[in-house]
């Protein structure tokens, strides 16, 4: 209790005072200290009956304060829970609205795609019917039926593909023969270092010569392209305006053949172009000699 705490505090203070005071002062003040102790004990004994009421009132106030704090804590917790529940409901509502919006957009997109698909099908059907009407009005390829005409086109395409394959094979064989003639076979078996060095030098000379030829031919081609452009500009200046070329309708068969030829042309390398340029130059020189 508070009374015992006060007594313990006084005893501690007395012990501390006893330790601090010296020998003579201790003898002189012993009687005075004893009288003070008796007086304090009497005061404590007189004030002891009123203390339980004070302690009970303090305990009531403390308990009341604790109950108020607990009530405030419960109210704060309930408010926090209410806010969290409100936030959760708000998030659920937003999520529901978002799902509904996404579903609505998806339905609109599906409806738009369906309408576009139906429109395309109607256009395709109209185009097909128009083509059938045209086929009925005029006969194609000597009065052949559509099935026979389709078969004939298929045979023509197969023949053209075979011819292109044979032509590509012949070009590859000619290219390989030209390369083999230009670069003879050699063997390094049984050769010493000096012979290998001489062989490397020979190859280096050939490579340098070929590079020079490539550079010369490229320069000639650039010069010819420049001259062609100059002549084209002069022709356009003479006519006074640019002449629009006459456009023609391209056949599907021709476009397919051109595509096959482009694929075959991509496989060729610079040596094939070099060979064709040399042949062109030889033909040009032969023509100039005949003109002279």
From Swiss-Prot:
InterPro entries from the UniProt entry: Troponin (IPR001978), Troponin_I (IPR050875), Troponin_sf (IPR038077)
Biased composition annotated in UniProt, kind: Basic and acidic residues: 58-134
Compositional bias segments (type: Low complexity): 46-55
BP term (GO), one: muscle contraction
GO molecular-function term, one example from the UniProt record: actin binding
GO cellular component: troponin complex
A Pfam family this chain is assigned to: Troponin
Record region (Disordered): 1-149, 255-292
N-acetylserine: residues bearing it: 1
Acetylation recorded as keyword: yes
UniProt key word Acetylation: yes
Keyword tags: Acetylation, Actin-binding, Muscle protein
Region (Actin-binding): 237-250
Entry function: Troponin I is the inhibitory subunit of troponin, the thin filament regulatory complex which confers calcium-sensitivity to striated muscle actomyosin ATPase activity.
Family from the record: Belongs to the troponin I family.
Protein name in UniProt: Troponin I
Annotated organism of origin: Chlamys nipponensis akazara
């Amino acid at each position: 209790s508070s009374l015992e705490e006060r007594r313990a505090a006084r005893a501690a203070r007395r012990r501390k005072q006893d330790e601090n005071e010296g020998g003579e002062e201790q003898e002189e003040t012993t009687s005075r200290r004893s009288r003070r102790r008796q007086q304090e004990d009497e005061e404590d004994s007189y004030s002891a009956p009123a203390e339980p009421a004070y302690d009970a009132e303090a305990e009531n106030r403390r308990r009341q304060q604790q109950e108020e704090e607990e009530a405030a804590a419960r109210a704060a917790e309930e408010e926090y829970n209410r806010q969290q529940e409100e936030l959760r409901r708000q998030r659920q509502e937003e999520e529901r609205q978002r799902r509904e919006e996404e579903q609505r957009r998806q339905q609109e997109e599906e409806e738009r795609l369906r309408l576009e698909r139906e429109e395309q099908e109607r256009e395709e059907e109209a185009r097909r019917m128009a083509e059938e009407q045209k086929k009925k009005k005029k006969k194609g390829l000597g009065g052949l039926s559509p099935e026979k005409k389709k078969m004939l086109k298929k045979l023509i395409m197969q023949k053209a593909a075979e011819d292109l394959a044979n032509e590509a094979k012949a070009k590859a064989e000619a290219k390989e023969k030209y390369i083999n003639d230009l670069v003879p076979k050699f063997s390094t078996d049984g050769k010493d270092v000096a012979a290998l060095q001489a062989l490397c030098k020979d190859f280096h000379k050939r490579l340098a010569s070929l590079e020079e030829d490539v550079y010369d031919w490229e320069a000639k081609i650039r010069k010819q392209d420049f001259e062609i452009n100059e002549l084209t500009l002069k022709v356009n200046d003479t006519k006074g305006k640019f002449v629009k070329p006459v456009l023609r309708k391209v056949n599907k068969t021709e476009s397919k053949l051109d595509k096959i030829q482009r694929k075959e042309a991509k496989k060729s390398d610079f040596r094939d172009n070099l060979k064709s340029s040399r042949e062109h130059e030889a033909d040009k020189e032969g023509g100039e000699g005949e003109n002279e």
